[in-house]
Amino acid sequence: MSLYPAIVRAYAAFRELQLARVHRDPMSVQRRTLLRLVRRAADTAWGRQFDYASIRSVAEFQRRVPIQNYASMKPWWRRNFDGEADITWPGLPPWFAATSGTTSGDKYVPVTRELLRSHARVSADLLALYARRRPDRARRLFGGVFLGIGGTTTLERRGAVQVGDASGIAAGRVCWPLTRWYSPGRDIAAIVDWEERIGRIAERAAKQNVTFLAGIPSWVKVLLDRVLCGAVRSRNPEPGTRNP
């Protein structure tokens, strides 16, 4: 089934008008966005620490809130693991993304529902605007499946939160009707072992009409190598074997 109905074009036209206003005055948009986030977090432990409720400008925010790094934020975020809510953002972050970072070993960064909604909106904007500007190619793009290569969607419970790879957390939240176009599917995405998961993804992808591919470049290369190796073996079977 095609993903190219009139509603996609209508959404793209609407968002293009909105984004045009952003492009005309990006500094003003960023300023309003910062102050909106500050107001939202004003009643958290972090917001009270720096009196977010009284901040009215970017300059005031810069003067009052010191530049932070992971080491300075870690004690605050660790409180979420113990079930404390309203620490650096309203409520309790359901998930934490595990990342090795570049220094100091593993790091755990909160992932909120608002963050995932923002990522989903960006993805929708990307596809819709592409469809609006290149309708000829978009019909082919939306006529196949979207293959995402990321971490496992099986998360680990750590206290009051769940921990996993950021891409796995996002993939696990893909909802209907997008699931019908999402590959490799929930069954394979939930496999924890990397070698088994990438092998199963390659097997399934080789049989699908993949028109959209997303993932970490190094992981994408591994997948494509597996698909190519499978194709070579299929065309040149070992002596004594038959093609399936």
Language model region names:
Residues 1-98, 104-233, 244:
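Nucleotide 5′-phosphate-binding alpha/beta core
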Residues 237-241:
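Intrinsic disorder/low-complexity segments
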